Regions:
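Beta-strand-rich domain onsets/edges
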Residues: 68-131, 136-141, 153-155, 192-213
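Short amphipathic beta-strand segments in non-cytosolic proteins
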Residues: 15-23, 146-161
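Extracellular Ig-like/FN3 beta-sandwich strand-entry sites
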Residues: 43-47, 128, 177-179
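A short, solvent-exposed beta-strand micro-motif common in secreted/extracellular proteins
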Residues: 48-51, 179-187
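Start-of-domain marker
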Residues: 1-36
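Short, ordered, surface-exposed loop/turn motifs in non-cytosolic proteins
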Residues: 7-11, 140-151
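Glycine-centered loop-to-beta-strand initiation motif
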Residues: 31-35, 164-178
Length: 213
């Protein structure tokens, strides 16, 4: 479900904890490990939100970039590109983690990020086996988009792929004692000004949502 990492402030654009009543910014220290450390005093359902600044990536080869496009079902969206040049990319992450000490206080976030997955139901409701979510780009639902679901229990790892409906919504069946990571990627070609500023051919946005059932 990813590798542990230390906190590095220049990567951060925003970091905050949200519940049904308030939003709390979370200042951290460089080098903190685990990267995010905070004491949650309020009871109920919380969402940890982390947004990064742009970071730079150069692919190892054109083939690696093609593999990425195929894996994320982005080949049609990208179309033709210069295969004589190893692609470069600037990427941002929009990561969320759902947390609770029970099933009270669930709320649905209002979309306000450039790219994000919003939980429409609580995975902690013991009466529900279906988890519903919605994908947004700059406040608008993103339809017919690939969502990749990684999950694991004590013995196995699992992978599932679904598509959002015309309202940007998706749903999956969830199982007890599993950790879930729901992921979506948006990739756009850099315009002339962006290429000059960021030295990148492509810009990507990564939205993730993590919870443990």
């Amino acid at each position: 479900m990813g590798s542990p990492f230390g906190y590095y402030d220049p990567n951060k654009k925003s970091l905050y904890l949200e519940n049904i009543n308030k939003v709390k910014d979370l200042p951290q220290r460089d080098g903190n490990f685990p990267a995010i450390q905070t004491l949650i005093l309020d009871k109920g359902f919380h969402i940890l939100n982390y947004e990064t600044n742009y970071e730079f990536l150069k692919y190892e080869s054109v083939e690696k970039f093609k593999d990425f496009l195929k894996e994320q079902d982005l080949e049609k969206a990208v179309g033709n590109f210069d295969t004589n040049k190893i692609p470069t990319e600037s990427y941002r992450r929009f990561a969320k983690a759902l947390m609770t000490d029970g099933n009270k206080g669930f709320f649905i976030q209002k979309p306000k990020l450039d790219f994000e997955i919003i939980a429409l139901t609580s995975p902690y409701n013991l009466e529900e086996e279906i988890f519903e979510f919605q994908l947004f780009e700059k406040g608008d639902p993103l339809e017919n988009w690939q969502i990749t679901i990684f999950s694991r229990d004590e013995e196995n790892n699992y992978k599932e792929i679904v598509k959002t409906n015309p309202n940007g919504m998706g749903k999956i069946k969830i199982f007890d004692n599993r950790t879930y990571l729901i992921s979506a990627v948006k990739l756009d070609k850099a315009n002339y000004i962006e290429k000059l500023k960021y030295k990148s051919d492509w810009f990507s946005l990564w939205a993730t949502l993590v919870f443990k059932k």
